[in-house]
């Protein structure tokens, strides 16, 4: 690491592009949300740069590891992504009344990508001089190599005013205790955006961000748990309301308190390991971090299984109207937590879903009775939900956390290839007719390849928390096999 400094440097847009192409730009997900700008946001920002309007500072932390200097984006991810997206032909911009794409012959980096067949010029093309002027725009970038604590403080002060981040985004950003880490892990797993490390290349970010209108990348937002089940609006999901819900549920579980008393101040305390609540939560997580993570993800997975089997969403099961959706969902999840903690699971998904669907009116009425305190209302509603679903629960063996890990790795198949290998199976299948006698027999060549991959994985330097994994496909039935 180089000596400490905090200076505003004038980097050109071309400098940023060259860093991106050489994989020299990284994103620390402890600080940065996923990509959230819409196409119109990006177009407006690029228009500002072309018109040479001033823009806010961008903050990066500089690393010098093995004599290679790289930069982590602490503040300004959305702006840098807009610049790179425009220069890589993802969208056109209107200049002087004419729409056009960036001229990729205007910079050496984009021209090289074109020559390598990695970038194709789209039509119509902007005037080359406009693109040359654009690449020369000087960006106000704060580069620093301060310690993590100082970077945290700088980041929070940068975002302490305005509407850059939601209250929860700011609470979560830069928090390093076990509670915040677990909220991040559960949330990203449920969203389908979990990565093996918090630090990823800028190139990876579009693949793990929620899709946006007019932008062809990322995770289809309508397929995400919270949207698929009608719990959150698209706007609330982009503002990290899903993370806040998980933080409330996790806080209530760890502190053994009603959901109703997990206030904003309690949440703030949970993110601070120096507070009493923060210490209680982190002390418990030292002993059972992985077990609690598995428990939460298991429930989310089971709720998805209900939908897959019955085509009935949580919204159809629980919500009689749009009122108090998240409150009712959290109480339902609390009941599921209690039951799964006692090693119980749903026996008949269809009957379970139908019973809840037919009872949702009484659940809502019970919840909206305001003759008692919120604590008593919560208890009464939890008791009612428990009574309704109790007859549908069966005793089960303890859950294997490896199931969650496999699902997470499969979701990462397009971006995480170093630590995971995917094999279609151990046997021959769909062989040409003259080799049909091999059908169903053990494929020794494939077994040998798997052994070689396993041997190679042992020689890869990696975090001990992320072991190498070989996932082999197995058909559920004969039709799946064929």
Features from the language model and the residues they span:
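Short, flexible beta-strand-to-coil junctions
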Residues: 61-66, 145-148, 252-257, 341-344, ...
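Polyanionic (Asp/Glu-rich) segments that form extended negatively charged tracts
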Residues: 192-339
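N-terminal extension/subdomain marker
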Residues: 1-20, 369-383
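Intrinsically disordered or highly flexible coil/loop and linker segments, enriched in small
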Residues: 54-55, 163-167, 192, 196, ...
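Short, cationic low-complexity segments
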Residues: 163-182, 272-281, 361-367
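Conserved N-terminal catalytic/coupling substructures associated with nucleotide/phosphate chemistry
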Residues: 130, 135, 274-482
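Basic- and aromatic-enriched surface patches that contact anionic nucleotides/nucleic acids
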Residues: 2-14, 28-251
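Active-site-adjacent bridging/hinge elements
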Residues: 17-22, 51-60, 216-226, 413-433, ...
């Amino acid at each position: 690491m180089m000596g400490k400094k905090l200076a505003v440097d004038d980097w050109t847009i071309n400098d940023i592009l060259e860093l991106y192409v050489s994989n020299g730009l990284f994103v620390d997900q402890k600080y940065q949300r996923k990509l959230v700008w819409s196409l119109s946001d990006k177009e407006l920002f690029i228009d500002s740069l072309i018109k040479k309007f001033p823009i806010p500072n961008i903050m990066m932390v500089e690393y010098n590891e093995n004599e290679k200097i790289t930069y982590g984006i602490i503040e300004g991810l959305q702006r840098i992504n807009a610049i790179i997206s425009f220069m890589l032909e993802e969208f056109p911009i209107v200049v002087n009344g004419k729409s056009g794409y960036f001229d990729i012959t205007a910079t050496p980096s984009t021209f090289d990508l074109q020559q390598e067949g990695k970038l194709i010029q789209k039509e119509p093309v902007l005037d080359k001089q406009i693109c040359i002027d654009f690449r020369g725009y000087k960006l106000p970038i704060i580069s620093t190599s301060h310690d993590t604590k100082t970077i945290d403080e700088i980041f929070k002060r940068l975002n302490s005013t305005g509407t850059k981040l939601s209250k929860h985004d700011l609470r979560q950003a830069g928090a390093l205790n076990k509670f915040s880490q677990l909220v991040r892990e559960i949330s990203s797993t449920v969203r389908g955006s979990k990565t093996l490390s918090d630090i990823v290349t800028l190139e990876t970010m579009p693949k793990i961000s929620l899709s946006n209108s007019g932008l062809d990348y990322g995770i289809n937002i309508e397929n995400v748990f919270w949207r698929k089940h009608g719990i959150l609006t698209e706007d609330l999901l982009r503002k990290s309301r899903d993370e806040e819900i998980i933080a409330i549920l996790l806080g209530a579980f760890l502190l053994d308190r009603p959901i109703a008393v997990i206030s904003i101040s309690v949440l703030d305390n949970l993110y601070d390991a120096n507070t009493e609540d923060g210490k209680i939560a982190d002390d418990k997580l030292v002993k059972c971090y992985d077990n609690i993570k598995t428990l939460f993800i298991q429930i989310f997975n089971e709720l998805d299984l209900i939908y897959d089997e019955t085509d009935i969403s949580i919204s159809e099961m629980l919500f009689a109207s749009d009122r108090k959706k998240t409150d009712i969902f959290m109480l339902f999840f609390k009941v599921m937590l209690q039951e799964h903690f006692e090693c119980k699971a749903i026996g008949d998904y269809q009957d379970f879903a139908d019973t809840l669907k037919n009872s949702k009116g009484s659940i809502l009425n019970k919840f909206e009775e305001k003759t008692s305190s919120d604590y008593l209302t919560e208890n009464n509603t939890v008791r009612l939900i428990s009574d309704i679903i109790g007859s549908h629960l069966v005793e089960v063996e303890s859950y294997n956390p490896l199931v969650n890990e496999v699902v997470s790795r499969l979701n990462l198949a397009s971006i995480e290839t170093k630590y995971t290998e995917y094999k279609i199976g151990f046997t021959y299948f769909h062989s040409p007719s003259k080799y049909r006698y091999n059908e169903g027999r053990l494929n020794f060549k494939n077994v040998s390849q798997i052994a070689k991959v396993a041997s190679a994985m042992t020689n890869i330097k990696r975090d001990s928390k992320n072991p190498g994994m070989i996932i082999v496909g197995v058909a559920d039935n004969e039709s799946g096999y064929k």
